Amino acid sequence: MNELIRKTNELLKNHGFEYAFCGGWAIDLFIGAQTRKHGDIDILAYWAERDAIIQYMQSLGFLVYEMLGGGKAHHITDVRNQIKCKRNIFCCTQDCEMVVLTETDEEGIYFIDFREVGQTKLNFIEFLFNDKDETDLLYARRHAVKLALSDAILYSGGIPYLSPEMCLLYKSTDTERKGYQSDYDNAMARMNQRQRRWLSDALTIMYPEGHKWMPL
């Protein structure tokens, strides 16, 4: 497996919180090979462990920002002072070349500009927070759409990753984004009948008027 993914997994494992790789890297972990260049590392995590993750990343020297929408982010210096209007945070080193932060008139709020340079160093991680119950992972956009945890979190060489059907459901909101269609094509070629059926049912619920990826 890719050395960057291995190092990230070593950084995150055994620190008291659950996680799984998501996004394009999760598709590659499912396939068993790198299929394209990836912009960054995306990690699925859970809301209940958000503070613990922030504090751990800060202890490693990472700067932590929560996304606000509108091209802005809030620098989290204290977990007691969060806005929590979006489900994702990003953690970067001081010298990370992947993001440019510009001060606004508001204290602790920055304009953000992500550079599509492709990540090659362990200097940036984005966490996307989700909910779960005792048995299922809940889709963030509609909790009624759920997938058994045993099916949602898979492993490749001991590295946890989000299953392809759930990854593709998240990617379905922006199919024109670079790499998303190839992720769909590559994953669909290898998904089993149960995975395809779950994705088909989920797309039908989320897009009752139809979707580019329907029917499967």
Residue ranges of predicted features:
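Compositionally biased terminal segments of proteins
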Residues: 1-216
